[in-house]
């Protein structure tokens, strides 16, 4: 899977796309910003944050 840097609203939009109706929890303290903004992350990384 391709990885990409996702920051701010782009990160939230990507979570909406990946998680769909399951929803997701966005807590910067969980490290998602470090994992997906500071470093590139994949769809599989994003799925870890879905509810």
Curated annotation (Swiss-Prot):
Official protein name in the record: Insulin
S-S bridge residues: 7-37, 19-50, 36-41
Signal peptide range in chain numbering: none
GO molecular function, one term: hormone activity
Subunit structure: Heterodimer of a B chain and an A chain linked by two disulfide bonds.
InterPro entries to which the protein is assigned, alphabetical: Insulin (IPR004825), Insulin-like (IPR016179), Insulin-like_sf (IPR036438), Insulin_CS (IPR022353), Insulin_family (IPR022352)
Record key words, sorted: Carbohydrate metabolism, Disulfide bond, Glucose metabolism, Hormone, Secreted
Pfam family, one: Insulin
Summary of the function given for this chain in its UniProt record: Insulin decreases blood glucose concentration. It increases cell permeability to monosaccharides, amino acids and fatty acids. It accelerates glycolysis, the pentose phosphate cycle, and glycogen synthesis in liver.
Major site of localization recorded for this protein: secreted
SMART domains: IlGF
Cellular component, GO annotation: extracellular space
Family, as annotated: Belongs to the insulin family.
One example of a Gene Ontology biological process annotation: glucose metabolic process
Location in or out of the cell: Secreted
């Amino acid at each position: 899977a391709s990885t990409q840097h996702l920051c701010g609203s782009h990160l939230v939009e990507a979570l909406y796309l990946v998680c769909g109706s399951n929803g997701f929890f966005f807590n910067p303290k969980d490290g998602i910003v470090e994992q997906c903004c500071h470093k590139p992350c994949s769809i599989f990384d994003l799925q870890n944050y879905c509810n």
